[in-house]
Swiss-Prot record:
Primary enzyme class: lyase
Entry EC no(s): 4.3.3.6
Pathway recorded for this protein: Cofactor biosynthesis; pyridoxal 5'-phosphate biosynthesis
UniProt entry tagged with the keyword Lyase: yes
Protein's UniProt name: Pyridoxal 5'-phosphate synthase subunit PdxS
Alphabetized GO MF terms: pyridoxal 5'-phosphate synthase (glutamine hydrolysing) activity
Function: Catalyzes the formation of pyridoxal 5'-phosphate from ribose 5-phosphate (RBP), glyceraldehyde 3-phosphate (G3P) and ammonia. The ammonia is provided by the PdxT subunit. Can also use ribulose 5-phosphate and dihydroxyacetone phosphate as substrates, resulting from enzyme-catalyzed isomerization of RBP and G3P, respectively.
């Protein structure tokens, strides 16, 4: 890679991460039409996520969940002045290209939609639009960052109104970061090798089908022209940055199961940079009040007296689901 290309890529990554930092400390709300988008903006949302259905309805409908209709996304973009994000399926580069052409402010390569690629996520560095991606653990987070994600969010378990999986993912990432900080650089390189292994799945599957040993050559490309060793080196650099910073090098939001102001405050208390709220707003009994209360909870997460006042007379939250009752675990989608 020539020097000019390296400088341009670094500049693009800086711009993408800069946009993500602009929404830090705020609430991003899922909306399905212009009216909901205006409610979110009036409540103080820093951005909205355009979908055809909120996650709870996607879960209920079943079938294949795809990118929202172009007309719906445009309707939402025309209705508000705050940034508009939209979801594409995991690995569906064509959907992502359409969203980029529409001019959305950020693309969410999301497990809430039905995955399109069973092996890989999109190589996000090929795009000018910034991406946000979900992660259950540090390995998933680092892989997405290496691919070019400008923002990470917990996966949680979308559409359930149950915060437990988001808490699990935050704790797993935070504890793994603390472990990385206690490791030597040599030990961290071993972690990078482990974290890079999912990129080998396609190559190993093809070798197995062909009756060949499950191994790759040193110069054998396995993903977007990169060899396994090149991917390891890239992940290793990110892990060293994490060791130095004591956190992810990109903005890190909570998502998946946030249904009340208390849920939002809990996520902020656990070190999150902000909160995505999917079904929790528009599946509650009073969306405008719930939206305002969750925004206030993120702003005052460390003030219990204020949180108590915020939580008064906001109506009923969305009906929650126990994780054990779920037939589909969206959080398990992706690699």
């Amino acid at each position: 890679m020539d020097k000019l290309k390296i400088i341009m890529e670094k500049g693009t990554e800086r711009l993408k991460r800069g946009f993500a930092k602009m929404v830090k400390g705020g609430v991003i709300m899922d909306v399905t039409n212009a009216e909901q988008a205006r409610i979110a903006e009036e409540a103080g949302a820093v951005a909205v996520m355009a979908l055809h259905k909120v996650p709870a309805d996607i879960r209920k409908a079943g079938g294949v969940a795809r990118m929202a209709p172009v007309e719906k996304i445009q309707e939402i973009m025309d209705a508000v002045t705050i940034p508009v994000m939209a979801k594409c399926r995991i690995g569906h580069e064509a959907e992502a290209r359409i969203l980029e052409a529409l001019g959305v402010d950020m693309i969410d390569e999301s497990e809430v939609l039905t995955p399109a690629d069973p092996f890989f996520h999109i190589y996000k560095k090929k795009f000018t639009a910034p991406f946000v991606c979900g992660a259950r653990n540090l390995g998933e987070a680092v892989r997405r960052i290496w691919e070019g994600a400008a923002m990470i969010r917990t996966k949680g378990e979308a559409g359930t109104g149950n915060i437990v999986e988001a808490v699990r993912h935050v704790r797993l990432v935070n504890e793994n970061i603390r472990l990385i900080q206690r490791m030597t650089d040599e030990e961290i390189y071993g972690v990078a090798e482990k974290f890079a292994e999912p990129y080998l799945r396609l190559a190993f599957s093809v070798k197995e089908i062909s009756g060949l040993p499950k191994r790759v050559l040193e110069n054998e490309p396995i993903y977007e022209g990169f060899t396994y060793r090149e991917i390891v080196e890239g992940i290793y650099k990110i892990l060293l940055e994490i060791k130095k910073l004591g956190r992810l090098p990109v903005v890190n939001f909570a998502a998946g199961g946030v249904a009340t102001p208390a849920d939002a405050a809990l996520m902020m208390a656990m070190g999150m940079d902000g909160v995505f709220v999917g079904s929790g707003i528009f599946k509650s009994s009073n969306p405008p009040k719930m939206a305002r209360a969750i925004v206030e909870a993120v702003n005052h997460w460390d003030e219990p007296d204020v949180l108590a006042e915020i939580s008064r007379e906001i109506g009923e939250p969305m009906r929650g689901q126990a994780i054990e009752e779920l037939q589909v675990r969206m959080e398990e989608r992706g690699v």
